[in-house]
């Protein structure tokens, strides 16, 4: 069984989130999604508009998602190992950065491949939040 993992805040769930989850599910048998807990969102200097429990339930109800787990830190490698994930799915805005090039090496050493999906243009939780202000 091929297990995939992705993580995010999923605040103000939108079509970009749905596209990522749909594409990810197309590449694995079981898709596990980490939803960032409110404390980690705050640590990163932001505030989620929707509380963790609601965001987790919204993601859990998506037909492409097999399981939801809390993302309480930024250590995706440890989480992938814990879950037995073969793939980590992320947005392509990280592709080619020095940090993610190094992550790719670390993940490959652990037998996990990072798959980058294109961001859906014209939509983001940040953009939606600004539109509502």
Located regions from the model:
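Nucleotidyltransferase catalytic core that binds NTPs
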Residues: 1-133
């Amino acid at each position: 069984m091929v297990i995939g993992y992705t993580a995010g805040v999923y605040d103000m769930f939108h079509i970009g989130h749905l596209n990522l989850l749909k594409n990810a599910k197309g590449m694995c048998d079981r898709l596990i999604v980490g939803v960032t807990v409110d404390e980690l969102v705050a640590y990163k200097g932001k505030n989620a508009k929707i509380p963790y429990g609601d965001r987790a339930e919204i993601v859990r109800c998506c037909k492409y998602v097999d399981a939801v787990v809390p993302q309480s830190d930024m250590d995706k490698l440890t989480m992938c190992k814990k879950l037995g994930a073969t793939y980590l799915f992320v947005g392509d805005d990280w592709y080619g950065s020095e940090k993610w090039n190094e992550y790719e090496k670390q993940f490959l050493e652990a037998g996990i491949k990072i798959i980058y999906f294109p961001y859906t243009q014209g939509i983001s939780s940040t953009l939606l939040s600004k539109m509502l202000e």
